[in-house]
Amino acid sequence: ERLRLCELAFPDADVTPMELRREGKSYTVDTLREISRGNPGAELYFLVGTDMLLYMEQWYEFRALFSLCTLAALPRADGDLAEIERYAAYLRKTYGARIEIIAKTPLPMDSTALRAALPRRGGADRLCDAVYSEIIRCRLYGAKPDLAWLRGKTDAYLKPTRIPHVRGCEETAARLALRWGEDPEDAAEAGILHDITKRLSDDEQLRLAEKYGIVLN
């Protein structure tokens, strides 16, 4: 699933599954060697964040890694740039490492926090639409859709005259859920989705029911 998400996130890049195919322990230096063998003469760049750069000396065969690529270091948080510059200077002097610093405004994000946000209907503002859509489609990481995002997606499947009705159902469902002690956001999601197939023909609806194993009388 992560391979598929990478392909969606970087449509213009060649995303390789070589590390998934590799048996046993897999190290970054092995991947760089394999890429280098397959692309003789190519200049390789390895994108790293502050947290990775500061612990490079603990990486497996880090000296060989330095010889195979240029490190492209990105700050992960405000205030990281000065620390990156100091440590990069040390690695250059001590090991002859090639390091380029990408002085961009950091986007505070970590994968653990992002995965934790997805079941709480967060994350849509941190991910490209293709990736977020796939996560919601497959319900990866227990994700629940951001309701504003879901409205934007479902409105395209509704006649304009149907949208006010759907909004009313969403609001009523949320109020009733609160009244009876249920999750109002889950109820709102059901309200948003309840008319999603209205524009489909009868044959299209039957095919959809068959696809999802819905038995019709």
Label every model-predicted segment.
Residues 143-158:
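Extreme N-terminal tail/first-helix region
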Residues 132, 174, 206:
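Short glycine-/small-residue-rich flexible loop motifs, especially phosphate/cofactor-binding loops
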Residues 1-146:
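Nucleotidyltransferase catalytic core that binds NTPs
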Residues 20-21, 156-160:
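A short glycine/serine-rich beta->alpha loop
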Residues 159-187:
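Alpha-helical phosphate/pyrophosphate-handling elements in metalloenzyme active cores
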Residues 130-133, 168-171, 191:
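Amphipathic alpha-helical interaction segments
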Residues 152-156, 179-217:
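Divalent metal-dependent catalytic cores for phosphoryl transfer on phosphate-bearing substrates
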